[in-house]
Amino acid sequence: MDFLLTEEQKKLRKLTRKIALEKILPKREYFDETEEFPWEIVKELASAGLFEVYIPAEYGGKGGGVTDLAVVAEELSRVCGGIALSFAGTALGTYPILLFGNEKQKKKYLPTIARGEKLAAFGLTEPNAGSDASSIQTQAKKVEGGYLLNGTKQWITNGGEAEVYTIVAVTDKSKGARGASAFMVEKGYKGFSFGKKEKKMGIRASATRELNFSDCFVPEENLLGKEGGGFIVAMRTFDKTRPGVAAQALGIAQGALDEALSHSRKREQFGQPISSFQDIQFKLADMATQIEAARALVYSVALLIDSGAEKVSKESSMAKIFASDVAVKVTSMAVQIFGGYGYLRNYPVEKMMRDAKITQIYEGTNEIQRGIIALNLIKEIVSKK
């Protein structure tokens, strides 16, 4: 599918693949086992300019878009979905600034993120507000010169490691979904602390923590967009970043296929490589076909967004559900091809299977995505009448 990419994007893919193989692959098992945050790898990504790819040139970036983000996310995830999340999670925390930040905010935050000096994160989910995001309880009370934040955010990617956080909090409970606002909150603000690092099934190299706010003062200048526009910030951000999750899923699936192909040529049973058996061949064929279909959808949606299309919620959700469902299927099939070896932790496909599952859950469960798609389909029919 590289015919969809520019020459610069093809070079970006090649560079990212090289970094993934040379820097991430040798440490993949270590970070999965220890669950340490991969700061040494983050520094390698930063020195290669990968955090710059989707940030405009005037703020220290390379001026790329969602397609560039997808290229990097796919190639990093092809080797390790967990380590890739330090990059993808930062994109999620950065896009609200790109989309809604004023000039002062962009100049303050984007250059350091582009250089990889600071990671970013996004805080919407709460203990009792997952899919029902409109039921968030974190409060932002207006006071002289700013706001006091009180509440808890849960399962935040890059939590505790990032320096810059986009937080959605309620500023006027009486207005429902229109009563939430988005704020830039910096690590180190008084009253802002972190809970324990979660122990997860997969993506173990990624830090997931609770964010706690106790009378945390946030300056008025840190309001992102308009007061009451918090959910607009969140939804428009997800439209841009869900193809990144899809690309992560795609990369995990491709990595699993790579491993399954290699193993099927080396593993012999009944005096011949298992790749000579029709059942294995059909599994490999199905895996490859599903991956190519996912790749076509992911990159066509990314290109649609980069073309300037305004309404992309339906397509963005389609890319996420299709690619993540493919990742879960393909990684499971890869484990099956490996047989008993696939269930052992010293072979990579069991990790890929664990990593794949989260792509069906975060940035909106696939059930929620199907609802978004259906709602948009119905709206399209109604608008034509």
Segments and roles (model prediction):
Residues S86-F87, I113, N128-S131, W155-N158, ...:
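Short Gly/Pro-enriched turn/cap motifs at secondary-structure boundaries
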Residues L99-G101, K141, I167-T171, M184-E186, ...:
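Short beta-strand-to-turn element immediately C-terminal to the catalytic PLP-Schiff-base lysine
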Residues G49, A73-S77, A169, V185-K190, ...:
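Short Ser/Thr-interspersed hydrophobic loop/turn segments at strand-loop and sheet-helix junctions
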Residues S135, G188-P219:
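Flexible, small-/acidic-enriched active-site or ligand-binding loops
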Residues M1-V79, I83, F100-Q105, T112-E117, ...:
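Alpha-helical interface subdomain recognition
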Residues G146, N150-F194:
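A short core secondary-structure module
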Residues G116-L124, V168:
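A short, Trp-centered hydrophobic/proline-enriched beta-strand micro-motif
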Residues A91-F100:
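Helix-loop "lid/cap" segments that line or gate small-molecule binding pockets
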